[in-house]
Design a protein with these regions (language model features):
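Bacterial N-terminal signal peptides
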Residues: 8-18
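Glycine/tyrosine- and acidic-biased, solvent-exposed loop/turn segments at the edges of beta-strands
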Residues: 17-157
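Bacterial N-terminal signal peptides that target proteins for export
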Residues: 1-8
Length: 157
């Protein structure tokens, strides 16, 4: 009787642990890539799920990058926030310096820059301001010195 109770308790514990673990979460080293599609090393089915690398969180849908990816510096500060859709950059793309200041901010659509583009000096002032339309610079671009003073304006053709 006691052996049966111990077995039932052990089995219940094992089942509860497996119910709360996420089988879709893996490490990047567990993936392989074939023609821009990601697979688990032992699978022929394109991978869908979350990949964890330290604090970084990367998401895949049908073997392609998908969703908001956030990566971190070793000090815990955010390194980048980028958005993917169907394996292409799509949405906000923000890069930060190790100290937490924004370095670059732009928007992508279907893998091409499409919208505003801001490059910042390390003191937080603008270094470059401009815009893209489907990967091509458009409109007025402004360039600034390290103190944030406007030094040049160029019209993109």
């Amino acid at each position: 009787k006691l052996k049966n109770k111990i077995f039932i308790i052990a089995l219940s514990l094992l089942l509860s642990i497996s119910a709360f673990s996420n089988p879709d979460e893996v490490r990047k080293k567990d993936l392989r890539i074939v023609e821009k599609i990601y697979y688990l090393k032992d699978s022929e089915v394109p991978f869908t799920g979350k990949v964890s690398e330290g604090r970084d969180r990367l998401y895949y849908l049908n073997g392609k990058q998908d969703g908001k990816w956030i990566s971190f510096y070793k000090n815990g500060n955010i390194k980048s926030i980028v958005t993917w859709k169907n394996g292409k950059l799509n949405g906000k793309y923000i890069i930060y310096e190790n100290n937490g200041r924004k370095s670059t901010e732009t928007i992508y659509k279907d893998g091409k820059e499409n919208g505003y583009y801001y490059l910042y000096n390390s003191n937080g002032t603008y270094r470059t301001k401009g815009a893209y339309s489907m990967g091509k610079p458009v409109g007025e671009w402004e360039y600034y010195d390290k103190d944030g003073k406007l030094t040049n304006k160029v019209i993109a053709e």
